[in-house]
């Protein structure tokens, strides 16, 4: 019974993570409901599993502390007259509670090497299929998502995402899995070739998306993976592997030929009319004004779209729903206290994650943790210029990867209740 419930939990987490991107990134109300209800159902299954066992074993995670403190901060904002818009804070609190549940359950479920390896392979297969769909839609598409749904967003759509940068965010988190599996010593050579091919195709679609922040984050990922994988070893092999991957990627890009990619980067040098065509820097400047007015606890979780128009320094007939910088938006909505907890989360993520990856080459579980840590790195870098953590599908995957990167596989680390 317990084993069956364990399988249900692991499969359920993977299905929820797979559902989000296919549902246009999980940004619509019905998709958010599925994510929240699915997370609650999985928590109930875990509780039933605990009742069926003679004792409940809970695997601790260092990130539980900043997450619980952050939950307490949001709970304080739900008190009367604490949030600029109580309902928006409540809605976002429910969504992030779902992320917290997925984080907790992932820590409990994915603690054995075999399950971690399966998760890494599942991410590879899923990412490859989504990438192939995106390439097909790019070259034989009709301007509609899934060839059926018109794109009403202002941004270019790629794959199932209405925003090309959010598609890049998904691939940033998934590409490290085939990359690490291709470099690991436990994979046979034919499988390494397949993993390498999947990584090249998935990586090429980041360039196909023409997301400048995504391309920069992907480049940082490759560099970080090269450095982390070479810890305690000769670096020549890791550098050669990274160089070979880049050459294969360039060859793939020559075949795919993303139209307008160079022009996208050339736009960075264009003069900006802050009054009518603001840049992300303008959004950040306006957001910092908001922080100065409520520096301690912020305006309320999820209230940025409501409060920002009062501080906007430019004219637009479009709704500005995010700061295009997740860290700045965190400071706006939860103040310096929430920002400090976010920094603590990132610090503990890397301190704990880097302590786990010493023997990644011959341990499938540790190699998956390495890939998860690199995936989190990519999204964190991208978050300086975009709002991927405001996209439910990407945020849910980020927190699951954080759980895998920091979770313990040691039997002695569990606590009994």
Regions found by a protein language model. Give the residues of each.
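TM-adjacent membrane-interface loops and short helices in multi-pass inner/ER membrane proteins
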Residues: 163, 281-321, 327-330, 334-341
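Flexible juxtamembrane loops connecting transmembrane helices in multi-pass membrane enzymes
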Residues: 156-160, 218-222, 253-286, 292, ...
């Amino acid at each position: 019974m317990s084993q069956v419930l364990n399988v249900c939990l692991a499969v359920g987490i993977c299905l929820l993570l797979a559902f989000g991107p296919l549902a246009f990134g999980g940004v619509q109300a019905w998709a958010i409901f599925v994510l929240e209800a699915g997370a609650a159902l999985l928590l109930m299954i875990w509780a039933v599993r605990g009742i069926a066992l003679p004792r409940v074993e809970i695997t601790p995670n260092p990130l539980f502390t900043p997450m619980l403190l952050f939950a307490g901060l949001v709970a304080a904002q739900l008190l009367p007259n604490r949030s600029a818009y109580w309902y928006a804070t409540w809605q976002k609190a429910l969504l992030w509670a779902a992320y917290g549940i997925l984080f907790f359950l992932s820590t409990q479920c994915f603690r054995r090497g075999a399950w971690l390896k399966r998760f890494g392979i599942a991410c590879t297969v899923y990412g490859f299929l989504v990438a192939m769909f995106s390439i097909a839609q790019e070259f034989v598409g009709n301007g509609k998502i899934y060839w059926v749904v018109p794109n009403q967003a202002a941004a270019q759509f790629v794959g199932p995402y209405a925003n090309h940068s959010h598609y890049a965010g998904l691939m940033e988190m998934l590409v490290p899995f085939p990359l690490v599996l291709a470099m690991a010593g436990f994979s046979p050579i034919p499988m390494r070739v397949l993993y390498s091919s999947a990584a090249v195709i998935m990586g090429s679609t980041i360039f196909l998306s023409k997301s400048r922040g995504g391309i920069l984050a992907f480049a940082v990922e490759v560099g970080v993976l090269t450095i982390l994988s070479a810890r305690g070893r000769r670096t020549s092999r890791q550098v050669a592997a990274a160089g070979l991957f880049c050459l294969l990627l360039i060859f793939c890009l020559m075949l795919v030929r993303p139209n307008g990619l160079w022009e996208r980067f050339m736009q960075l040098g264009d003069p900006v009319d802050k009054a009518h065509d603001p840049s992300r820097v303008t959004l950040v400047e306006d957001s910092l004004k908001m922080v100065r007015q409520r520096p301690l606890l912020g305006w309320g979780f999820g209230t940025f779209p409501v409060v920002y128009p009062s501080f906007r320094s430019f004219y637009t007939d479009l709704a500005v729903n995010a700061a295009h910088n997740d860290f700045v938006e965190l400071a706006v909505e939860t103040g310096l206290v929430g920002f400090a907890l976010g920094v603590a989360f990132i610090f503990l993520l890397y301190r704990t994650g880097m302590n786990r990856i010493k023997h990644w080459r011959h341990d499938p579980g540790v190699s998956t943790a390495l890939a998860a840590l690199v995936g989190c790195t990519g999204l964190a870098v991208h978050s300086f210029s975009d709002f991927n953590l405001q996209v439910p599908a990407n945020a849910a995957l980020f927190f699951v990867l954080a759980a895998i990167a920091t979770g313990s596989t040691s039997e002695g680390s569990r606590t009994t209740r």
